[in-house]
Amino acid sequence: EYQNKTGFYTPYTLDVSVLIVNSALTKDIKIEGYDDLLNSKLKGKIATADPSNSSSAFAQLTNMLVDQGGYENEQAWTYVKNLFSLVDGKIASSSSNVYKSVADGEMAVGLTYEDPALKLLNDGVDVKVIYPKEGTVFLPGNAAIIKNAKHIENAKKFIDFLLSQDIQDKLGTETTIRPNRKNAKTNKNMKSMTEINIATEDSGYVIQNKSAILKKYNDIFTNIQSKQ
């Protein structure tokens, strides 16, 4: 599915929106997906960055909208309103502060992405990495060749190198970046895609309507803050 279908770029890695959960702080709370975050016990303990200036936070926003009914679905936006009411105005200053605050025990759960979450898990930190049961969006990381590149044949060889079995296996086993090759090897903490409920992002829609999506989010967040 994540293949070069346009001729303009080639996907070679996959970025994944996940929830990172502090095990010690959530012993009595079941967290398997987005719906489980709407728990009053988590008020002020949900870490997220600002979707307006964080690509991972924006990916989380569009992921939850897809899962809750769609980008223009009012029920989906009601979910966003309810979730950010529990965030309680505590927006992390950066994407890295999201997973760090959960690892440090400051926050109970964070809206983050797979790479740093798996690094913490591999390092033995007492966290869980949750792939939302409602649906997890996989966004491709792409490589492209510049038009009229001086060394076009070498550029093509480099793309082939990125997609080779050896490099894809190394990505999956020696890093925490998910390879795009279907049969690539992965480390033990990288959950198989066959075990994940995969949701599909309408990338064309999101690109064309990013400003409108962010305006809707910012209006909701501002309204929440005005009432606190």
Where are these regions (language model features)?
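Short, catalytically relevant binding-site loops at active-site mouths
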Residues: 97-98, 115-119, 134-137
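Ligand-binding "clamshell"
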Residues: 1-7, 119-131
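Extracellular/periplasmic bilobal clamshell ligand-binding domains
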Residues: 188-228
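A ligand-binding cleft/hinge motif common to bilobed small-molecule-binding domains
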Residues: 103, 108-126, 175
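Mature extracytoplasmic/periplasmic domains
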Residues: 136-137, 141-201
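Non-transmembrane alpha-helical segments in soluble domains
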Residues: 35-38, 65, 81, 99, ...
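Extracytoplasmic ligand-binding site segments that recognize negatively charged/polar headgroups
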Residues: 1-106
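Periplasmic-binding protein-like
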Residues: 79-85, 91-92, 123-147
